[in-house]
């Protein structure tokens, strides 16, 4: 009975370790062939994805001569390894080059800034004898917003003009006008914008014209992501995978709880 209690407490302590463990990959260089002569290590590395935190075992590196050397890939980028025994690299191709990817997750794209669609004149639309400056007052136009000019086709049109054309009601050539009856203009740049109707007297006598100031686009919401965990010390196992401990403090607490519980029950 006491043995069953001890085993149960051990399992509780082991479960306490699990939140502190994350999965990494341990690559046995050359698989069953290992690190040796006359082996195509580039073919072996092809299609493998090496990430920060993974390990190579046993790869060659300066000062590693144990026969089971483990290197943790701590930084992204190109990595090169060779055997330093004479002729092993030059004559027998005992060398390896890999590309290590960043283990941090890619940040989510920034949320696009909200855009506003303005129907010029609201329910009155684009027509004569409407005070469009009063309509525009109090509105904040930003880059990316749109203006919708709604009117009866053939009765009005829309021209974008400069300040002089706006003040004197001078319309550009007819080919530059918008005439669909439902003209949508995207505000692509900040600054002053002027629009008029090109029909005779509509601008000069009936005030069918609009001037607005467009502000720069609002700042986008920056992406938020958690930083990648710092690579820990891998534990070598035979399956080709390894566990890396991300929090020694959690391990200590889990072990202390297990020991305390066992001593209480014995």
UniProtKB/Swiss-Prot annotation:
Q: State any single GO MF term.
A: metal ion binding
Parts of the chain that traverse the membrane: 245-265
The record places domain Phytocyanin at 25-56, 57-102, 116-216
- Tell me, which GO biological process terms does this entry list? response to symbiotic fungus
CDD domains with a match to the protein in the record: Phytocyanin (cd04216)
Any S-S bridges, and between which cysteines?
Answer: 169-203
What Pfam families has UniProt attached to this entry?
Cu_bind_like (PF02298)
Sites of glycosylation? 47, 162
The membrane-topology field of this record reads: Single-pass type I membrane protein
Query: Which first-to-last residue range defines the signal peptide?
Result: 1-24
Q: Which residues bind Cu cation?
A: 156, 197, 202, 208
| The protein, known as | Blue copper protein
Source organism phylogeny: Eukaryota, Viridiplantae, Streptophyta, Embryophyta, Tracheophyta
* Gene field: BCP
């Amino acid at each position: 009975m006491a043995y069953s209690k001890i085993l149960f407490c051990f399992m509780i302590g082991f479960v306490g370790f699990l939140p502190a463990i994350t999965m990494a990959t341990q690559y046995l260089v050359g698989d069953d062939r290992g690190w040796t002569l006359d082996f195509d290590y580039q073919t072996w590395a092809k299609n493998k994805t090496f990430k920060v935190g993974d390990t190579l075992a046993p790869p060659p590196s300066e000062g590693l001569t144990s026969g089971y050397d483990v290197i943790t890939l701590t930084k992204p980028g190109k990595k090169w390894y060779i055997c330093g025994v004479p002729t092993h690299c030059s004559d027998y191709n005992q060398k390896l080059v890999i590309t290590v990817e960043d283990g941090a997750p890619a940040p989510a794209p920034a949320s696009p800034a909200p855009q506003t669609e303005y129907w010029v004149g609201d329910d009155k639309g684009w027509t004569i004898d409407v005070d469009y400056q009063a309509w525009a007052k109090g509105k904040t136009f930003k880059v990316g917003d749109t203006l919708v000019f709604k009117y009866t086709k053939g009765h009005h049109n829309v021209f974008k003009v400069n300040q002089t054309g706006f003040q004197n009601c001078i319309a550009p050539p007819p080919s530059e006008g918008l005439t669909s009856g439902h003209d949508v203009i995207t505000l692509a740049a900040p600054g002053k914008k002027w629009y008029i109707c090109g029909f005779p007297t509509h601008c000069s006598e009936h005030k069918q014209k609009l001037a607005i100031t467009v502000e720069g686009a609002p700042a986008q919401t920056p992406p938020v992501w958690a930083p990648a965990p710092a690579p820990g010390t891998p534990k070598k196992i035979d399956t080709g995978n390894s566990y890396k401990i991300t929090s020694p403090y959690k391990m200590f607490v889990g072990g202390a709880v297990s020991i305390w519980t066992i001593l209480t029950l014995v």
